[in-house]
């Protein structure tokens, strides 16, 4: 059993008969009253996000996990299929296990958390950002750059993101995977 002082981002815990991954936390010590920890918990089974507050010293059940590198193979409409790069075993995951499934392109290597108790995959840790090619966007209008105007663009995986007006079809852009937002254009 762990306590609230052990809480950190990425920690997997069992709470209310489900397994959650801590995505955000904040230790709060008010001037009056006991300390507590505010957390955002993401269910690894349903994908739902839960805001929860633990009082200081509260005992939590930590889930032991291992990390393994997997290569994304393909998506068949219902499942995303991955192959372990060490022993070539394949697993399939539902969309709930992936934070931003439309940002993974075929052949990309990601880290998957696996529960050591039952060897079940829990979640996929994406890289901080990915580089994708813009396949469709409207042309930018000259003289419309006085403000930070954006336009929608579709990238090679089908994900839609708002980009600045100077981005054209065929450009490679970097997208932050945690929020799914445009970061920068990649020059070749």
Swiss-Prot record:
GO molecular function list: translation elongation factor activity
Any one GO biological process: peptide biosynthetic process
Major site of localization recorded for this protein: cytoplasm
Keyword field: Cytoplasm, Elongation factor, Protein biosynthesis
Domain of life, source organism: Bacteria
Location in or out of the cell: Cytoplasm
SUPFAM superfamilies, A to Z: Nucleic acid-binding proteins, Translation proteins SH3-like domain
GO annotations of cellular component type: cytoplasm
Pathway: Protein biosynthesis; polypeptide chain elongation
Recorded family membership: Belongs to the elongation factor P family.
PANTHER family named in the record: ELONGATION FACTOR P, ELONGATION FACTOR P (EF-P) FAMILY PROTEIN
Protein purpose: Involved in peptide bond synthesis. Stimulates efficient translation and peptide-bond synthesis on native or reconstituted 70S ribosomes in vitro. Probably functions indirectly by altering the affinity of the ribosome for aminoacyl-tRNA, thus increasing their reactivity as acceptors for peptidyl transferase.
Annotated protein name in UniProt: Elongation factor P
């Amino acid at each position: 059993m762990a306590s609230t002082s052990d809480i950190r981002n990425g920690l997997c815990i069992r709470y209310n008969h489900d397994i959650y991954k801590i995505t955000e936390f904040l230790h709060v010590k008010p001037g009056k009253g006991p300390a507590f920890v505010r957390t955002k918990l993401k269910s690894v089974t349903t994908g739902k996000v839960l805001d929860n507050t633990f009082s200081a010293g509260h005992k939590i059940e930590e889930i032991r996990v291992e990390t393994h590198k997997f290569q994304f193979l393909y998506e068949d409409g219902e499942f995303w299929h991955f192959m372990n790069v060490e022993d070539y075993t394949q697993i399939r995951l539902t969309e709930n296990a992936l934070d931003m499934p439309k940002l993974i392109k075929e052949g990309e290597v990601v880290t998957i958390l696996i529960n050591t108790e039952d060897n079940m995959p829990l979640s996929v840790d994406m890289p901080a950002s990915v580089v994708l090619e813009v396949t469709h966007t409207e042309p930018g209008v000259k003289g419309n750059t006085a403000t930070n105007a954006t336009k929608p663009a579709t990238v090679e995986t089908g994900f839609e993101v708002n980009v600045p007006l100077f981005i054209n079809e065929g450009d490679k852009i970097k997208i932050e995977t945690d929020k799914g937002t445009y970061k920068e254009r990649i020059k070749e």
